[in-house]
């Protein structure tokens, strides 16, 4: 198995027996982790606020239905 390291480094991938594995820099990995954690945090906040929002909407409907 021979690897053309200059070409593969230029592409940013490592070819091992026909399987391409992406090589990411630590900054890219940190950015991806931050994005995932932010999405999880926002999702958790929405889940916790959803019952309050639904109660508020129901209360507004009751007030203005009369």
UniProtKB/Swiss-Prot annotation:
Record keywords: Oxidoreductase included? no
Q: How does it assemble?
A: Homomultimer.
Tell me which UniProt keywords the record has, alphabetically. Cytolysis, Host cell inner membrane, Host cell lysis by virus, Host cell membrane, Host membrane, Membrane, Signal-anchor, Transmembrane, Transmembrane helix, Viral release from host cell
Q: What topology does it adopt in the membrane?
A: Single-pass type II membrane protein
Superkingdom to which the source organism belongs: Viruses
Record flagged with keyword Transmembrane helix: yes
Q: Which stretches of this protein does UniProt put in the Cytoplasmic compartment?
A: 1-29
Q: What is its main location?
A: host cell
Could you tell me what this protein is called? Holin
The GO terms this record gives for MF are: pore-forming activity
Provide the Gene Ontology terms for cellular component.
host cell plasma membrane; membrane
Per the entry, what this protein does is: Accumulates harmlessly in the cytoplasmic membrane until it reaches a critical concentration that triggers the formation of nanometer-scale pores (pinholes) causing host cell membrane depolarization and endolysin refolding and release into the periplasmic space. Once the pinholin has permeabilized the host cell membrane, the SAR-endolysin is released into the periplasm and breaks down the peptidoglycan layer. Determines the precise timing of host cell lysis.
One GO term (biological process): killing of cells of another organism
TM annotation in the entry: 30-50
| Side Periplasmic, residues | 51-66
Disulphide bridges? none
Which species does the entry assign this protein to? Pseudomonas phage phiKMV
Compartments annotated for it: namely:
Host cell inner membrane
């Amino acid at each position: 198995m021979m690897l053309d390291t200059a070409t593969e480094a230029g592409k940013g991938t490592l070819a091992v027996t026909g399987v391409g594995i992406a090589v990411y820099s630590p900054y890219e990995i940190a950015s991806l982790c931050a994005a995932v954690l932010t999405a999880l945090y926002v999702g958790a906040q929405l889940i916790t606020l959803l019952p309050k929002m639904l109660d508020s909407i129901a209360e507004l409907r009751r007030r203005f239905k009369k």
